[in-house]
């Protein structure tokens, strides 16, 4: 066999693999920062579209508390401080959408800060119990950025990670909604300090979006469900009590009317002599 022919035959699978990879990377992705539509200045709205179809939607308010150290007044020790970082509206968005995994990356201040949210699906495709969840959170930061951190803070880029996360578990095909504030602890590479992420006014759907920019049916978090029950329970009890009172009044009225129409029989036997 000709050497050139053999070489060409061997190259074909490699070329096909490269073409496949290249075509996948060419998948057209659009990111939308729609935070300006929210009346709440602290709330952010994001959407990711691939090939003209919305594949991830997210709305939430995020605040991050980061402990860090600055030199003490004696210039020997270190004092512990805490930075409060609000997710701003002018955020750079990136993301990825796959069948069973999705990611949302949010960066700001020239990527001095980056918040990454990871989502995954669970269960078999044919199973009715199939669901999705937030499976991982990463926050990247550098205390030497002086817009938020005090000067003199220990420099160095750090990453705060979640461990064994299973948040916002939602039935497949539904969106997740939670007005209540959720507190999530992350462990930092900065001497294992605990970074705290607060999420509120959350509405998320990282999979199975049927219409562009339209959430599927909402699955409310347990806290919101309890709050809704607490708000509606007094109304239900009031209506039940009102109906019970109406029934009692109606029964009394009917009973009174029936007894009024009956012939009154004298109880004193001496009165019987006047009868007949």
Curated annotation (Swiss-Prot):
Residues carrying a glycan: 33, 51, 100
Signal peptide range: 1-27
Cytoplasmic compartment residues: 253-276
Subcellular location: Cytoplasmic vesicle membrane; Cell membrane; Cell projection, Dendrite; Cytoplasmic vesicle, Secretory vesicle, Synaptic vesicle membrane
Matches recorded under Pfam families: Lamp2-like_luminal
Record bears the keyword Secreted: no
Post-translational modification: Glycosylated.
Sorted UniProt keywords: Cell membrane, Cell projection, Cytoplasmic vesicle, Endosome, Glycoprotein, Membrane, Signal, Synapse, Transmembrane, Transmembrane helix
A GO cellular component entry from the record: plasma membrane
Gene3D superfamilies listed in its UniProt record: 2.40.160.110
Regions that span the bilayer: 232-252
Its membrane topology: Single-pass type I membrane protein
Extracellular face residues: 28-231
Keyword Membrane set for record: yes
Any coiled-coil regions, as ranges: none
Predominant location: membrane
Protein family (similarity comment): Belongs to the LAMP family.
Role noted for this protein: Plays a role in short-term synaptic plasticity in a subset of GABAergic neurons in the brain.
Protein name: Lysosome-associated membrane glycoprotein 5
């Amino acid at each position: 066999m000709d050497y050139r022919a053999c070489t060409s035959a061997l190259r074909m699978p490699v070329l096909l693999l490269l073409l496949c990879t290249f075509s996948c990377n060419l998948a057209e992705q659009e990111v939308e920062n729609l935070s300006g539509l929210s009346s709440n200045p602290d709330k952010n709205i994001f959407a990711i579209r691939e090939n003209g179809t919305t594949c991830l939607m997210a709305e939430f308010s995020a605040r991050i508390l980061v402990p860090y150290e600055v030199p003490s007044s004696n210039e020997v020790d270190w004092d512990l401080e805490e930075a409060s970082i609000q997710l701003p509206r002018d955020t750079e968005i990136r993301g990825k959408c796959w069948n069973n995994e999705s990611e949302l990356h949010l960066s700001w201040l020239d990527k001095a800060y980056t918040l990454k949210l990871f989502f995954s699906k669970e269960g078999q495709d044919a199973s009715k119990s199939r669901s999705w969840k937030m499976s991982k959170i990463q926050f990247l930061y550098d205390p030497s950025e002086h817009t938020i951190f005090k000067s003199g803070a220990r420099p160095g880029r750090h990453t705060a990670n979640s461990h064994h996360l299973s948040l916002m578990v939602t039935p497949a095909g539904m969106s997740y909604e939670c007005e209540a504030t959720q507190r999530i602890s992350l462990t930092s590479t900065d001497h294992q300090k605990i970074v705290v992420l607060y999420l509120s006014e959350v509405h998320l759907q990282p999979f199975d979006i049927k219409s562009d920019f339209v959430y599927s049916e909402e699955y409310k978090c347990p806290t919101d469900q309890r709050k809704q029950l607490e708000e509606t329970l007094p109304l239900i009890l009031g209506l039940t009590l009102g109906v019970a009172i109406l029934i009692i009044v109606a029964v009394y009225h009917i009973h009174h009317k029936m007894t009024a129409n009956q012939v009154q029989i004298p109880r004193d036997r001496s009165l019987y002599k006047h009868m007949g």
